[in-house]
Amino acid sequence: MTEKRAVILLSGGLDSATVVAMAKAEGYSCYTMSFDYGQRHRAELNAAARVAHDLGVVEHKVIGLNLDGIGGSALTDSSIDVPEAPGEGIPVTYVPARNTVFLSLALGWAEVLEARDIFIGVNAVDYSGYPDCRPEFVEAFERMANLATKAGVEGQGFRIQAPLQNMSKAQIVQAGMARGVDYSLTVSCYQADDDGRACGKCDSCRLRADGFKAAGIEDPTRYF
């Protein structure tokens, strides 16, 4: 039987941890990729390593990037405050072209591994309004992936899988719990402290808390 491999973007948060569990349940050998890109804290990278170990991935890779050299986001520029109240439009926590960059590197690793599937935990229901989380973006990237790679041109097509795309945060939590995700290992907060404790005020914290509440499941998040 041929091994079914997948590269999965793993941030260390709730959504990406759920995606790893979903891919594993579908019989994939999971290769996870995280990025040290100049974000506000390293707690999410520590969380990603914990999740990768707990879910038994084949290999977990951390890639260094200097997106803080570009700036333009509250997540990569410490002079921009993380908003603690809902606002209009695309928030300042949007990191310019982040998912495009991350998926491009995942695509490269997938080609090396001869993996045909790349998973990403984007969501367009309970989300912050980022343009690179929409179905149109995922579909467009998949088309590009199959035009821009040796494997794609030779007919070994790639699939960009976004299984959470149309799920509510409550549904995501329920799906993860059903597949054995330990959410106490994850960190979602935009401004978590070094110990991984959350602020409870940012948009990501609100979405996470609302998801657990709507799912009727106890939230294991620790706050500072």
From Swiss-Prot:
Its cofactor is Zn(2+). It is an enzyme of class 6 (ligase). SUPFAM superfamilies: Adenine nucleotide alpha hydrolases-like. The keyword Cell membrane does not apply. GO terms for biological process: queuosine biosynthetic process. Its EC number is 6.3.4.20. Binds 1 zinc ion per subunit. It catalyses: 7-carboxy-7-deazaguanine + NH4(+) + ATP = 7-cyano-7-deazaguanine + ADP + phosphate + H2O + H(+). Gene3D superfamilies: HUPs. Pfam families: QueC (PF06508). InterPro entries: QueC, Rossmann-like_a/b/a_fold. ATP binds at residues 10-20. GO terms for molecular function: ATP binding; ligase activity, forming carbon-nitrogen bonds; zinc ion binding. Keywords: ATP-binding, Ligase, Metal-binding, Nucleotide-binding, Queuosine biosynthesis, Zinc. Pathway: Purine metabolism; 7-cyano-7-deazaguanine biosynthesis. Zn(2+) binds at residues 189, 199, 202, 205. Catalyzes the ATP-dependent conversion of 7-carboxy-7-deazaguanine (CDG) to 7-cyano-7-deazaguanine (preQ(0)). HAMAP family: QueC (MF_01633). Belongs to the QueC family. This is 7-cyano-7-deazaguanine synthase. It comes from Pseudomonas putida (strain ATCC 700007 / DSM 6899 / JCM 31910 / BCRC 17059 / LMG 24140 / F1). The gene is queC.
